[in-house]
């Protein structure tokens, strides 16, 4: 009798252990699913294309008004629309402003969810003053360029090479070419620096590019997701 009771007790313990293991496994699988879905939602929130309208002009007495009116003026100036195919087949577009034939060329890459005209106001003015030519590029998944997702430099760095190759072929190997980017664009041109460019690509200018994609994602998660949601 005692032996039978002992066996029943052992059996009950075994069943309890199996239940605990089953619960742990289910919770683990559930956590993985939640993590996967959450990661996808965060990625979509940050990196998916948005058909962002141009910012409102604001009022005539603020700094934004002056900046955006300059951007609108640049957009309306005479320029040549350039379309290239990236190495993965994505159509990329930019606008070329010629100040002087055979002058050095600056290929400009805008910032995170930015606009080439808006972010490009300072370099356009400098190029006009120095009599350089400038190409304002719309990065993938922004404005006129194709793509549903941008990758914070993972793919965009190769787009820099494609733009450099196009410029070297179009303007000739004797034309000095510089890549310049601001914010995310700055990080992109820096990330491209170890890739194979034509010899006419002479330099890279990084204006306040982020240091790591991880920090960039963390910053945008905090500003884009609901308050209290862990990042």
Q: Can you name each region flagged by the protein language model?
A:
Residues 27-84:
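An N-terminal hydrophobic leader/cap segment in hydrolases
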Residues 87-98:
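A short loop-to-beta-strand scaffold at the N-terminal edge of the catalytic core in hydrolase folds
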Residues 103-111:
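Short beta-strand element of the alpha/beta-hydrolase
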Residues 112-125, 139:
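The serine-hydrolase catalytic nucleophile loop
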Residues 127-146:
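Conserved alpha/beta-hydrolase
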Residues 150-171:
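Alpha/beta-hydrolase active-site loop
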Residues 171-183:
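Alpha/beta-hydrolase fold nucleophile elbow
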Residues 191-231:
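Hydrolase active-site cap/lid region
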